[in-house]
Amino acid sequence: MFRRAFLAFSAPVLLLAVLFCCPAISLAQGSSAAATQAPATQAQIAALERQVQAAQMAGDNAWMLVSAALVLLMTGPGLALFYGGLVRRKNILGTMMQSFAMMGLITLVWAVIGYSLAFGRGNGFIGGFEHIFLRGVSLAPNPAYAATIPEQTFMIYQLMFAIITPALITGALAERVKFGALAVFLALWSLVVYCPMAHMIWGVGGLLNINGGLWPCLDFAGGTVVHVTSGASALVAAIYLGKRDGYPDNAMPPHSMVLSFIGACLLWVGWFGFNAGSALSAGPLATSAFINTQFAAAAAAFSWTLVEWLQNGKPTALGAISGAVAGLATITQASGYVQPMSAVVIGLIAGVVCCLMVLKVKKFFGYDDSLDAFGVHGMGGTMGALLTGLLASGAINAVFGADAAGHPRPVGAVDGNPGQVLNQAIAMGIGWVLAIAGTLLLLLLIDKTIGLRVSPAHENEGLDLSQHGEEGYEFSS
């Protein structure tokens, strides 16, 4: 009896104990499992983050290497063909060699000391010697310039800018300069003019750097660094060297518009690497610069052609391709800062103003800028500097950060920052002064030592034979 009563009483108690204990056991086991799984989950998340970062770096690096190749394409064969077709037949090889020589010579200068002077840590004017012979330039990123690509990729990309900038100057000296003298002049020019300007605007601690400079300058892809300096130097060099024999009394038309046409198309394509590549990553900013590049080139080709058509009664291929290059030069500085329709406006203005510089102003003053390096690049870069300060938008590139409410701070005058136009003008003025002073000093030095200009006999013979001993075209009798 007692046994039955005990079992009747204990059975429900045991059942309740099991019911209450099982969840506790389960929770204890779950807590133990969770404690075991937590580090594993965190490790998986960290591994995924590393994979995402590696994928981003691989994508950015691939885009930047392609962009570097596109910019090199601008010099050779792009600029070489563009300039080569514009000269007389007896000077085509000499002219193309001037561009090609920069691809080799400036590469060596850049590797030895140029990169260090432009992007090494120095003062507000020029970099130091920390990267001489590329010392310390590794496959690891340099966050001061580009956080998702190796510094060697950044270095080689910037090299392509250093190559094409002095090559642009050769257009003002076409058909009358000694090859050796030109090579020495441009190698020194890259150190005296280009590297300081690149450091002031793009280098850490630069006087005009957008991050902490005394006069922050918006120069996305080199409007001032490349086009103002090369254009101003081209004007000084053209005036110093003097006119070609027979200019302007004798007609000196391009010997092959076909070559120039092909060269201009290659320049246009390469410019996507020039501008969109300056985003230094394969992100939305590269897309913005890419679109602005296309829009400005198209608008400038249209407006130059229209002005020429209205004045002369016929549109020319030379006018169309010159307009496109003018638009590309002018949008360079603004490409990563403005809205697409602002790029159209910049292109339309560039085509008209640069056309008038070439057709009217050059004729009025009488200087012999043989291939219009100043009229297209110098004037285009100067306009681009000011128009960038006017039209830059924080909605495209919040380069000055955001306010407390999270809205982009004003960037250009249309954004509510009119002072940026003054900063742009100061930077552009410094570029002009540096280019004029440095170019004149080097020209005087070289002219007094090895001489700059070929003899009248060699000029009449042509640079192909007199400077290189070969001809661009062989015609069988």
Model-based region annotation:
Residues 27-477:
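Glycine- and aromatic-enriched membrane alpha-helices
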